[in-house]
Amino acid sequence: MRFTNIVTSFIKNGDRILILKRSDKVKSMKCLWAGVSGIIEKNDTSPLARAKTEILEETGINEEKIELLKANKQIKIEATQYKNHEWNIFPFLFKTENPEIKLNWENSEFQWIKPNEIKNYETVPE
């Protein structure tokens, strides 16, 4: 089975978390809501380093404006859109205070939601 290593970060601001709507220009999971995500590259020093890079690229929030709250265990999920493929997801939770969000081309919208509101959004697979 093939696999892809991915980071997914959720950013907390008070009692809300940031979710992003993936644009129709990305390769997979188009127009679905998710945390800040990206593929871990071969030259990345760690999943945490990649998570911080993705946060900057996708939201404009730099490393000085975020604080790591939790790094969870790796999660393995079968990729439904590819045969014999697995996503290895490295999840992170960060906090920030009232950041200005500047989306890049990978996402078309963002929302600050209470965690229990996630059920109201069409999200990437769990």
Where are these regions (language model features)?
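Active-site segment of metal-dependent pyrophosphate-handling enzymes
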Residues: 60-100
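Conserved N-terminal beta-strand and adjoining loop/helix that marks the start
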Residues: 1-18
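Conserved hydrophobic "DFG−1" position in protein kinase catalytic cores
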Residues: 11-12, 19, 94, 112
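NUDIX/MutT-family hydrolases
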Residues: 91-95, 102-126
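Conserved Nudix-box catalytic region and its N-terminal flanking loop in Nudix hydrolases
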Residues: 16-58
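Short aromatic/basic micro-patch
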Residues: 34, 86, 112
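Short secondary-structure boundary/capping segments
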Residues: 1, 9, 25, 84, ...
